[in-house]
Amino acid sequence: MKTHLLGNQHQWIIESHYEDKEEFDFHWDKKVFPSETREDVSDQTSTYRGKQFNIHPDAYVNEWKFKPHLQEQIDKVGLPIQITDLCALWIIEYKKGGWQKAHRHSDPNVKKLSAVVYLTDADPDPTTFHGGTFAYLYDGEGNTHDLCYKPNRGDLLIFKSTVLHGSYPVRESKKVFVVDYFYEDKYV
């Protein structure tokens, strides 16, 4: 997936790829989670037929490498923002038939971005979006742009956390890793 920007200053999505996706497989081993994060929090979220586990920031072993990669992708497309602090991170495993309803990670008053790393391939059937992700971009002028993705392992979506998004039902198990960061505007 080539790095490129979709959207405008109101809402945006960057499509990219993260070569070192194996680093995120480490977080699937529950032994690395502090005990308070072993609880499935899916019932508190918009995940259906799947499990969602929060990850304690102290267990996040590859931030030193991933955060600069995100900033590099943001700089590459010319967005004037600087990633600051880690906000939250979690993993989701969708079971057969699992999906996620449309939701946002933030309200408009919080400057936050989300990064989703796909750890499994989407359904190979080119006629369907099973296992794909959808998003709706609002351009600030009342227009909506509907986007659909069929990500492969290692594909990365970085988006403003106010972007409405979700996932289509899966035919097989699917895993994703999600990280939210705060950001601030860069003034040139």
Description of each model-found segment:
Residues 1-82, 99:
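Non-heme Fe(II)/2-oxoglutarate
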